[in-house]
Amino acid sequence: PSLKNIFKEYCDDLSEHDPMNGDLSNWAKNGVLLLNTVLTVEESRPGSHAKKGWEEFTINSIKFVLEHQPDAGFICFGMPALRLAEKVIMELDIKHPILINTPHPSPLSVYRGFYGSKPFSRFNAERKKRGLEVVHWALPTYEQKTLF
């Protein structure tokens, strides 16, 4: 459900079509990394794999990206993501990072500010303001799918 809500906000924010097929390879080609603070979960048990080591893995992954791509930025969906990003930013002493924060897109919090938050256009506006290349967020339709 959260990814569907991200897609809805994507469509509303950027006036894009509904990607329908879930192919995010264009985002990856544009340097976008989607990463949860915890990468696995038991079905119907949110947070069931928290504090099992995933947070440290995620922190180290973000550090690796920032050490090799210092202009990388963050779109944080929810407070756990924001806290984790802020921790890495402080540890690496990054000055003036691009940090876009929204409520989490889960069904429980989507109407508490996620819808209408425009994270994609805000992220690009910040990159453009800094003279950085913007992310090309367009996603393929079924007919354009090129994964295989």
Predicted regions: what is each one?
Residues 143-148:
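DEDD superfamily 3′-5′ metal-dependent exonuclease/proofreading module
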